Amino acid sequence: MAGIQDLKGKTAVVTGGGSGIGKGMCRRFAHQGMNVVVADIEGEAAEKVAIALRTEGARAIALACDVSQRSDIESLAAASIDEFGAVDVACNNAGIFFGGKLREFTEGDWEWTMSVNLMGVVHGSTIFGKHMAERGSGQIVNTASIGGWAPDPNCAPYTTSKFAVVGFSEALRRDLEPDGVGVTILCPGPVATGMAKADRLRPASAGSSNATSLAAEPVMAVGMPPDDVGDLVIDGIRENATYVFTHPDFGAAFEPRFDEMRRALARTPKPRTGDVRPEDLS
């Protein structure tokens, strides 16, 4: 299935659009002549981005949105469609990160991470996916991570959420392809963003934490420019690419995992079939 070749006049919704990778995508989409909906839990940040885009001549609106709340995504979709008539590209990009030893993470850390990084993607994909399937076209871009393929130490909740985003998005791609809707999985490496400062957004329901979000700050500070990620995403949309990676050198980090899988498969005997006992099926 081909991707969306001509983006001019199309509409993109970007969660986490007030900063970082989301902001970079918003800017690059606007430069392509797209209408842009900048969605962010920090409404003021989203508005600043939208104002800057409008100053450059783009059609852009800002909407406050907590992606962990399905009702917020439903409202986001409704407002976007009311404003621009349809949504052609939905980027489920909002995410949080903090690091620490496994024993340091609280139940609140896990629940908050999953509610944003995974369920935010699920909410956006199912709501915008339904809209696109009914129209017979569209592209969903879900932000995972290099960490969704090659886990780093000291960030178990984040890694778990991003592995889940990869698996969910691969399944979603197969589900939506017959409806003419593409799904692309964005897997960034280090990008110059403020995601490592997620603690400022921590809800009261998540309680206090012994972990810290500051561990990744030095890496983020020397990361790839967010606008460059936006350009790669546009290429991925046009190709209906399954994956978009930002750092090709990181491919070497995948090999130990793949090697372990190949060794495990090679030493595994073929399963027996037949000889099924009725009690095995009870």
Regions found by a protein language model. Name each.
Residues 43-44, 63-75, 107:
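The beta1-alpha1 cofactor-binding region of Rossmann-like NAD(H)/NADP(H)-dependent oxidoreductases
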Residues 178-248:
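SDR active-site lid
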Residues 125, 161:
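Active-site helix of classical SDR
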Residues 2-37:
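Canonical Rossmann dinucleotide-binding motif of NAD(H)/NADP(H)-dependent dehydrogenases/reductases
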Residues 101-102, 106-111:
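Substrate-binding pocket helix/loop in short-chain dehydrogenase/reductase
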Residues 145:
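Residue(s) in the substrate-gating loop at a strand-loop-helix junction
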Residues 103, 150-156:
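Active-site loop immediately N-terminal to the catalytic Tyr-X3-Lys motif
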